[in-house]
A protein has these predicted regions:
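C-terminal catalytic "cap/lid" subdomain
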Residues: 1-279
């Protein structure tokens, strides 16, 4: 099973308000349509929040339940997110990819931002039907915080216990995880993240330079590190050319930053997991 997250920085104008880049969505849809025989039943798609997921909570004070939000606005994150998921589903359908959108607050409950209970069985049915499951972040209900904003970067971890994930690819608006020189001008790509260097690489990551409330590159890398210690390969790479998707999914050493797992997925059992990062 492969999971690809296409960043909101690619599929929307991230500094706007609910401003989709329909042409980019269509290009990804058409590429996946061409490869559908190979991908159907093996691929889960996640779309980033972009100017939906990161702008709506600011407009309606829903970034955090401690803010003065209004009850009549509680629905707005989910309504707008599902508008975005529906648009993606519609474009994929027009291009010949059968999709099914999942609304995240309907199947996940968190406690202090961490997923506590979630129901993945319907996703397995969608995959068995050779339909592409499509996910996004959302406002989700939280036992200790009332609600929280759940990033699309954290969706892949919901599948790891139930499915044998091979690789999770995150396509975004930079080449991968970059290291900046001291005056912040020169930057070089970090090609590989391992059990040995992940602490140092994490120090290079930070928030997004665009409108973003979920932690930018840092949250992305942390999510992929937790997956690495469950035996899942991770890739962070540029998706400004949608043609980069297939090599990112299938090449042994894809462009961008490769996060090499430090347990063997094939033999992985709970007790085997060598957790040095966070699970
Ligand atoms: N070390 C780093 N290397 C590369 N980018 C970094 C680094 N640290 C922070 N960033 C920022 O992280 C951004 C990518 O994260 P961001 O969450 O904005 O992307 P996305 O996943 O495409 O969007 P969305 O979260 O809306 O889906 C980059 O554009 C950059 O501004
Ligand atoms: C999508 C929501 C609700 C939050 C933001 O999501 P992300 O930009 O995909 O991390």
């Amino acid at each position: 099973m492969y999971v690809v997250k296409i960043g909101g920085s690619l599929l929307t104008n991230k500094d706007g308000y609910c401003a989709p880049n329909r042409e980019m969505v269509r290009q990804y849809a058409s590429l996946i349509a061409k490869e559908w025989d190979r991908l159907s039943g093996n691929l889960i798609l996640i779309v980033g929040g972009g100017s939906y997921g990161n702008a709506v909570p600011i407009r309606y004070n829903l970034k955090d339940a401690s803010l003065p939000w209004r009850e009549q606005d509680l629905s707005m994150m989910t309504v707008k997110m599902f508008e975005w998921l529906s648009l993606v589903t519609e474009i994929f359908r027009e291009e010949g990819v059968p999709c099914y959108p999942f609304q995240t607050s309907g199947y996940v409950i968190t406690d202090d931002k961490h997923p506590l209970r979630y129901f993945i069985e319907p996703v397995q049915h969608v995959l068995e039907t050779n339909v592409l499951p499509v996910f996004s972040g959302d406002l989700v209900f939280d036992l200790s915080r009332k609600f929280t904003i759940f990033s699309s970067d954290n969706i892949p971890e919901l599948f790891v216990e139930r499915m044998r994930l091979t690789r999770v690819v995150m396509m975004t608006d930079v080449e991968g995880v970059m290291r900046f020189d001291q005056d912040g001008h020169e930057r070089t790509l970090i090609p590989t993240v391992t059990k040995e260097n992940f602490r140092e690489v994490l120090l290079c990551t930070g928030p997004s330079r665009k409108q973003d409330i979920t932690g930018g590159m840092k949250n992305k890398l942390e999510a992929l590190l937790r997956l690495a210690e469950r035996g899942v390969e991770g890739v962070i790479t540029s998706g400004s050319d949608p043609e980069a998707l297939l090599p990112a999914l299938f090449d042994e050493r894809p462009a961008g930053t490769f996060i090499r797992p430090w347990v063997n997925n094939m033999r992985r059992q709970k007790a085997d997991v060598d957790c040095v990062f966070g699970m």
